[in-house]
């Protein structure tokens, strides 16, 4: 992972995604304006086109475990969006495909390498998980675990998939 000052200056967004069986949610915060950016694929709401246009416009992103998960899912969406749009997939069909890939990505993380190498991703990524060495077996920590250790006001697990 590259963290040169030039790359750090180009980051414009902090982001996270949530993938459920029938829902995809993308949330970002512009680091300059603090504007919240939201894209949803669920039921009657299908922001796929806008999400893809937005992802392609980014200079960089900051996240937690985003190199192994969030950016992988976003790259999968970008790689498949054209087919989904041409075949007129519903939001439910799209979220089903995203969910399957998400589960494969989670299962693959125990084995090693992600599907998309960092240099093949749609934009530069700064991964706080790797930057602070939480991927080291002696220090491995989840975002929820860090929130609890920092006495975060509200720390909850999502009880559904």
What are these regions (language model features)?
Residues 34-53:
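Nucleic-acid-processing active sites and adjacent nucleic-acid-binding tracks
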Residues 2, 15, 21, 32, ...:
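Conserved catalytic core of nucleotide polymerization and phosphodiester-bond processing enzymes
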Residues 24, 32-34, 67-161:
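Metal-dependent phosphoesterase core characteristic of DEDDh/y 3'-5' exonuclease domains
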Residues 9, 58-59, 122:
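Short, well-ordered alpha-helix to beta-strand connector turns
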Residues 9-19, 127:
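Two-metal-ion RNase H-like nuclease active-site motif
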Residues 1-10:
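N-terminal accessory regions of nucleic-acid-interacting proteins
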Residues 59-67:
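Acidic beta-strand-to-loop metal/phosphate-binding motif
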């Amino acid at each position: 992972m590259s963290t040169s000052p030039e790359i750090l200056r180009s980051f414009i967004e902090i982001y996270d995604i949530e993938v459920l069986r029938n829902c995809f949610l993308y949330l970002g915060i512009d680091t300059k304006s603090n504007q919240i950016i939201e894209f949803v694929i669920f039921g009657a709401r299908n922001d796929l086109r806008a999400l893809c246009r937005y992802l392609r416009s980014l200079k960089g992103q900051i996240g937690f475990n985003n190199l192994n998960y969030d950016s992988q899912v976003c790259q999968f969406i970008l790689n498949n969006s054209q087919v989904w749009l041409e075949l007129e997939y519903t939001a439910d069909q799209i979220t089903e495909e995203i969910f399957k890939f998400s589960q494969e990505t989670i299962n693959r993380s125990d084995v090693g390498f992600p599907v998309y190498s960092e240099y093949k991703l749609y934009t530069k990524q700064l991964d706080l998980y790797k930057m602070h060495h939480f991927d080291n077996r002696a220090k491995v920590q989840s975002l929820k675990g860090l929130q609890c250790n920092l006495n975060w006001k509200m720390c909850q697990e999502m009880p559904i998939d």
